[in-house]
Protein backbone atom coordinates (compact mmCIF):
# COMPACT_ATOMS: atom_id res chain seq x y z
CA UNK A 1 0.00 0.00 0.00
CA UNK A 2 1.37 3.39 -1.03
CA UNK A 3 0.65 6.27 1.30
CA UNK A 4 0.83 9.75 -0.17
CA UNK A 5 1.99 12.16 2.47
CA UNK A 6 2.07 15.92 2.10
CA UNK A 7 5.20 17.30 3.68
CA UNK A 8 5.44 20.80 5.05
CA UNK A 9 7.84 21.62 2.22
CA UNK A 10 5.64 20.42 -0.64
CA UNK A 11 3.89 22.91 -2.89
CA UNK A 12 0.14 22.83 -3.47
CA UNK A 13 -1.45 21.67 -6.69
CA UNK A 14 -2.82 24.74 -8.47
CA UNK A 15 -5.77 24.85 -10.85
CA UNK A 16 -7.88 27.51 -12.47
CA UNK A 17 -11.60 27.41 -13.04
CA UNK A 18 -13.22 29.58 -15.69
CA UNK A 19 -16.81 28.34 -15.65
CA UNK A 20 -19.29 27.48 -12.88
CA UNK A 21 -19.93 24.10 -14.52
CA UNK A 22 -16.36 23.11 -13.64
CA UNK A 23 -17.13 23.44 -9.92
CA UNK A 24 -18.12 20.15 -8.32
CA UNK A 25 -20.43 20.08 -5.29
CA UNK A 26 -17.41 18.94 -3.26
CA UNK A 27 -15.31 21.93 -4.37
CA UNK A 28 -18.21 24.33 -3.75
CA UNK A 29 -18.46 22.98 -0.20
CA UNK A 30 -14.72 23.31 0.34
CA UNK A 31 -14.73 26.90 -0.97
CA UNK A 32 -17.52 27.79 1.47
CA UNK A 33 -15.82 25.98 4.36
CA UNK A 34 -12.52 27.73 3.62
CA UNK A 35 -14.18 31.16 3.48
CA UNK A 36 -15.94 30.51 6.80
CA UNK A 37 -12.74 29.29 8.49
CA UNK A 38 -10.71 32.25 7.19
CA UNK A 39 -13.34 34.80 8.21
CA UNK A 40 -13.98 33.30 11.64
CA UNK A 41 -10.23 33.22 12.37
CA UNK A 42 -10.04 36.98 11.72
CA UNK A 43 -9.00 36.93 8.08
CA UNK A 44 -9.77 39.89 5.83
CA UNK A 45 -11.60 37.95 3.11
CA UNK A 46 -14.78 39.84 2.34
CA UNK A 47 -16.90 39.24 5.44
CA UNK A 48 -15.72 41.85 7.95
CA UNK A 49 -18.04 40.91 10.82
CA UNK A 50 -17.46 37.36 12.08
CA UNK A 51 -18.72 34.92 12.95
CA UNK A 52 -20.22 33.78 9.67
CA UNK A 53 -21.99 30.55 8.82
CA UNK A 54 -22.89 28.58 5.71
CA UNK A 55 -26.11 30.56 5.17
CA UNK A 56 -24.03 33.79 5.08
CA UNK A 57 -21.29 32.55 2.78
CA UNK A 58 -23.04 30.12 0.41
CA UNK A 59 -25.10 32.71 -1.51
CA UNK A 60 -22.06 34.96 -1.99
CA UNK A 61 -19.99 31.99 -3.13
CA UNK A 62 -22.69 30.94 -5.59
CA UNK A 63 -22.90 34.46 -7.00
CA UNK A 64 -19.12 34.57 -7.43
CA UNK A 65 -19.05 31.14 -9.10
CA UNK A 66 -21.93 32.09 -11.38
CA UNK A 67 -19.87 34.97 -12.73
CA UNK A 68 -16.84 32.90 -13.71
CA UNK A 69 -15.87 33.45 -17.33
CA UNK A 70 -12.66 32.69 -19.26
CA UNK A 71 -12.11 36.35 -20.21
CA UNK A 72 -13.61 38.14 -17.18
CA UNK A 73 -13.29 36.19 -13.92
CA UNK A 74 -11.18 33.20 -12.97
CA UNK A 75 -10.96 31.21 -9.77
CA UNK A 76 -7.55 29.81 -8.87
CA UNK A 77 -7.38 27.06 -6.26
CA UNK A 78 -4.58 25.45 -4.27
CA UNK A 79 -4.94 21.89 -2.99
CA UNK A 80 -2.95 19.37 -1.03
CA UNK A 81 -4.10 15.81 -1.70
CA UNK A 82 -7.53 16.95 -2.98
CA UNK A 83 -8.12 19.14 0.08
CA UNK A 84 -8.65 22.83 -0.66
CA UNK A 85 -5.89 24.86 0.99
CA UNK A 86 -6.74 28.27 -0.48
CA UNK A 87 -8.11 30.24 -3.37
CA UNK A 88 -8.12 33.62 -5.10
CA UNK A 89 -10.14 35.38 -7.82
CA UNK A 90 -8.74 37.25 -10.82
CA UNK A 91 -11.12 39.79 -12.38
CA UNK A 92 -10.67 41.42 -15.77
CA UNK A 93 -12.89 44.13 -17.23
CA UNK A 94 -12.54 43.99 -21.02
CA UNK A 95 -13.67 47.60 -21.47
CA UNK A 96 -10.98 49.22 -23.64
CA UNK A 97 -10.20 52.02 -21.19
CA UNK A 98 -9.23 49.62 -18.37
CA UNK A 99 -8.78 46.36 -20.25
CA UNK A 100 -5.01 46.34 -19.71
CA UNK A 101 -5.28 45.61 -15.98
CA UNK A 102 -6.99 43.16 -13.66
CA UNK A 103 -8.12 43.08 -10.04
CA UNK A 104 -7.31 40.51 -7.36
CA UNK A 105 -10.03 39.56 -4.87
CA UNK A 106 -10.58 37.15 -1.99
CA UNK A 107 -7.08 35.73 -1.56
CA UNK A 108 -7.36 33.30 1.31
CA UNK A 109 -5.55 30.37 2.83
CA UNK A 110 -7.41 27.94 5.08
CA UNK A 111 -6.04 28.38 8.63
CA UNK A 112 -4.91 24.73 8.71
CA UNK A 113 -2.57 25.41 5.76
CA UNK A 114 -1.11 28.78 6.75
CA UNK A 115 2.65 29.14 6.73
CA UNK A 116 3.08 26.68 3.85
CA UNK A 117 3.38 29.14 0.97
CA UNK A 118 -0.19 28.70 -0.28
CA UNK A 119 -0.93 32.43 -0.61
CA UNK A 120 2.37 33.10 -2.35
CA UNK A 121 1.85 30.18 -4.74
CA UNK A 122 -1.66 31.40 -5.59
CA UNK A 123 -0.42 34.93 -6.25
CA UNK A 124 2.45 33.72 -8.47
CA UNK A 125 0.02 31.59 -10.49
CA UNK A 126 -2.47 34.44 -10.74
CA UNK A 127 0.28 36.74 -12.02
CA UNK A 128 1.29 34.19 -14.66
CA UNK A 129 -2.31 33.70 -15.83
CA UNK A 130 -2.92 37.45 -15.96
CA UNK A 131 0.19 38.03 -18.06
CA UNK A 132 0.37 34.93 -20.25
CA UNK A 133 -3.29 34.05 -20.81
CA UNK A 134 -5.16 37.35 -20.49
CA UNK A 135 -2.39 39.62 -21.77
CA UNK A 136 -2.72 42.00 -18.82
CA UNK A 137 -0.04 44.56 -18.05
CA UNK A 138 -0.79 45.24 -14.39
CA UNK A 139 -2.81 44.05 -11.41
CA UNK A 140 -4.59 46.03 -8.69
CA UNK A 141 -5.85 45.10 -5.25
CA UNK A 142 -7.28 46.73 -2.15
CA UNK A 143 -6.89 45.26 1.33
CA UNK A 144 -7.49 45.94 5.00
CA UNK A 145 -4.65 47.63 6.85
CA UNK A 146 -3.02 46.45 10.08
CA UNK A 147 -3.15 42.78 9.10
CA UNK A 148 0.45 42.46 7.85
CA UNK A 149 -0.83 42.18 4.30
CA UNK A 150 1.23 45.11 3.03
CA UNK A 151 4.43 43.22 3.81
CA UNK A 152 3.11 39.99 2.29
CA UNK A 153 2.23 41.64 -1.01
CA UNK A 154 5.45 43.71 -1.04
CA UNK A 155 7.51 40.51 -0.85
CA UNK A 156 5.73 39.40 -4.03
CA UNK A 157 6.68 42.56 -5.92
CA UNK A 158 3.59 44.67 -5.26
CA UNK A 159 3.89 48.31 -4.24
CA UNK A 160 1.49 50.49 -2.31
CA UNK A 161 0.07 53.27 -4.50
CA UNK A 162 -2.54 54.73 -2.20
CA UNK A 163 -4.48 54.47 1.00
CA UNK A 164 -7.99 55.36 2.12
CA UNK A 165 -7.41 56.46 5.75
CA UNK A 166 -10.02 55.20 8.18
CA UNK A 167 -12.09 53.63 5.41
CA UNK A 168 -12.99 50.40 7.19
CA UNK A 169 -14.84 50.48 10.52
CA UNK A 170 -14.75 46.99 11.98
CA UNK A 171 -15.95 48.09 15.42
CA UNK A 172 -16.53 51.43 17.16
CA UNK A 173 -12.94 51.35 18.43
CA UNK A 174 -11.37 49.62 15.38
CA UNK A 175 -11.14 51.72 12.23
CA UNK A 176 -8.58 50.70 9.62
CA UNK A 177 -7.07 52.07 6.46
CA UNK A 178 -7.75 50.37 3.17
CA UNK A 179 -4.54 50.25 1.16
CA UNK A 180 -4.28 50.06 -2.61
CA UNK A 181 -1.52 48.06 -4.28
CA UNK A 182 -0.20 47.68 -7.81
CA UNK A 183 1.83 45.00 -9.53
CA UNK A 184 3.39 46.39 -12.69
CA UNK A 185 4.96 45.06 -14.84
CA UNK A 186 3.73 41.51 -14.70
What are these regions (language model features)?
Residues 18-106, 110, 123-125, 129, ...:
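Acetyl-CoA-dependent GNAT
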Residues 120, 132, 145-163:
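Conserved active-site alpha-helix within GNAT-family acetyltransferase domains
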Amino acid sequence: MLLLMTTHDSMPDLAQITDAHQVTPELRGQLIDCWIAVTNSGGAAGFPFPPVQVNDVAPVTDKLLGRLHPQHRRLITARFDDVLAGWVVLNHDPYRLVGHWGTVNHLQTHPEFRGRGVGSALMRELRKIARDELGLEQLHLAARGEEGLEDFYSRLGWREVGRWPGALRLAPDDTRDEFLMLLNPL
